[in-house]
């Protein structure tokens, strides 16, 4: 694949009066041209520092950032500014100019780039139409809702036709309905304009909604990288499992039996797998946990079931093998007490 951004051994250390703080540690990532790439992690994991290193608002202390194959480390400040022209960025806090109406806000980066005013205004009008605000061009930021402000910020960020759009927690201050609208807009811009998008977030729902691939970051390091559907179906890292299954722990007494984690792969999520297994094998099944998600039009998810009895366990496994369902046997034992620790996702 053609990489537009490559991070090679990138690290970032902040020097404080209380000592050095390593914000990023040996980050290696390739972001492909034209994709929507997500970077997710808990607060303090290093997500925002990572995105600020990509456009060199923060200078890495180790490794380097490569944009279209060219390393930024050896560039002059003028050369870096030229590279930044190909990178748009939107933030959680919109950062609009309060004394300018929204048309002039979108014109601002064009003016800085030396675009003649008539051409800049024409381009700004086109973008306001694209983001659904053509009727509000004379309004000021204070007169807009949060979602409308973010639409203006997006229009401004892509005004100079950047090749890359960086989104740093762009929807975390918005309500769920407005968040969906903004994510749909970002996805639409990605398709229509061919802009590569990097999405920084702490919300798995954002990743599921629009991203092609995702990197999970924890404690300043990359925990795992892959296609969204693959990581959702079978997360390998502990932080991946926590982000996908949730963070509310519930402990349940389990008398006995095997616990199986069934993985739905898009093909099978809409099939009555469990019902068919119970009818076919004539075995009782206890559902301990279940969750499915729609990712890119296909359903993915997990189900954790308990089966009592060795014979029943073998019947279930043979059935799952026969229909080519992916599953894993889980061990949730805790010392001498057989218990299960289930992580349940918070539902809005």
What are these regions (language model features)?
Residues 55:
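Helix-to-loop junction immediately C-terminal to a conserved catalytic motif
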Residues 139-142, 160, 167:
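Conserved signature/switch motifs of ABC ATPase nucleotide-binding domains
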Residues 225-226, 234:
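ABC ATPase "signature
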């Amino acid at each position: 694949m053609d990489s537009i951004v490559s991070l090679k051994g990138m690290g970032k250390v902040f020097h404080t009066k209380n000592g050095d703080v390593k914000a990023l540690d040996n980050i290696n990532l390739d972001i492909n041209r034209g994709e929507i790439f997500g970077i997710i992690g808990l607060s303090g994991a290093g997500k925002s520092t990572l995105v600020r290193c990509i456009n060199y608002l923060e200078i890495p202390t180790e490794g380097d950032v490569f944009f279209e194959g060219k390393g930024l480390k050896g560039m002059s400040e003028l050369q870096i500014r030229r590279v930044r022209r190909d990178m748009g960025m939107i933030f959680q806090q919109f950062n609009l100019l309060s004394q300018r109406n929204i048309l002039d806000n979108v014109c601002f980066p064009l003016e800085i780039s030396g675009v003649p005013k008539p051409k800049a205004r024409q381009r700004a009008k086109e973008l306001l139409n694209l983001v659904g605000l053509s009727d509000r061009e004379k309004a000021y930021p204070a007169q807009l809702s949060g979602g409308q402000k973010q639409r203006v910020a997006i229009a401004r960020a892509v005004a100079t036709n950047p090749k890359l759009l960086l989104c740093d927690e762009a929807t975390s201050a918005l309500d769920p309905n407005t968040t969906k609208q903004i994510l749909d807009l970002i996805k639409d811009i990605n398709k229509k304009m061919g802009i590569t998008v990097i999405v920084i977030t702490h919300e798995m729902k954002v990743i599921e909604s629009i991203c092609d691939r995702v990197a999970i970051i924890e404690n300043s390091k990359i925990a795992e990288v892959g296609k969204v559907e693959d990581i959702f179906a079978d997360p390998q890292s502990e932080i991946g499992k926590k982000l996908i299954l949730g963070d509310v722990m519930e402990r349940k007494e389990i008398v006995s039996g095997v616990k199986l984690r069934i993985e739905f792969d898009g093909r099978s999520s809409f099939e009555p797998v469990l019902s068919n297994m119970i009818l076919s094998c004539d075995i009782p099944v206890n559902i301990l946990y279940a969750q499915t998600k729609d990712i890119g039009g296909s359903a993915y998810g997990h189900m954790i079931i308990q089966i009592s009895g060795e014979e029943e366990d073998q019947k279930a496994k043979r059935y799952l093998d026969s229909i080519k369902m992916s599953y894993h046997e889980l061990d949730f034992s805790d010392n001498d007490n057989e218990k299960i620790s289930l992580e349940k996702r918070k539902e809005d």
